[in-house]
Amino acid sequence: MWTWRGRPVTELSSAELMRTDPKLVWEWFDYRRGLLTEITPNAGHYALVEWERRFEAFTLITQNIDDLHRAAGSLNLLEVHGNIWRARCLRCASTFEARETPLEEVPTCFVCGAAARPDVVLFGELLPEGIFERAEEAARRADLFFVIGTSAVVYPAAGLPVAAKQAGAQVIEVNPEMTDISFLADYTLLGKAGEILPQFLKERG
């Protein structure tokens, strides 16, 4: 079990701890943000940006909260689990950028002054209203649906390839190993996204 300061990460990233000890939750997420400052987008991120430039109807649906897709230049982006560099007010629900790290104190809302929380989906919470519906609509409209670097076990997002397939899309999986959705993929490309996507772009455009 992965722990930090002796606490399971599932507890540190939980809605329950956000209610009882928001300062500790922020300290945990600030630790994670500090690690992310050393990470930059890879060739796979940039390949997706290039696809977006080439195709008018392109939607990138991500469960990642690290902001690397946006840093690479992706525009039509649905962050279904939120963004670790954004905060959301606990009173008025306004969202705002919160990029200072390390944090000196818990961020407060620029609108009403109340305390804020990380704008991410915590354990024990539902997805933000409307975000999955938009993702599912994009999946059902797709002619080609890539499933990239996911274990395909976190629902409801893991159901999106099924929705795309049922609507007639061709599904291509890119992953280091087989997953629970490999059986429905038309093609499974085994390997790292940072290596496979640029090569796929070069060969197929």
Language model features with spans:
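Conserved catalytic core of sirtuin-type NAD+-dependent deacylases
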Residues: M1-G205
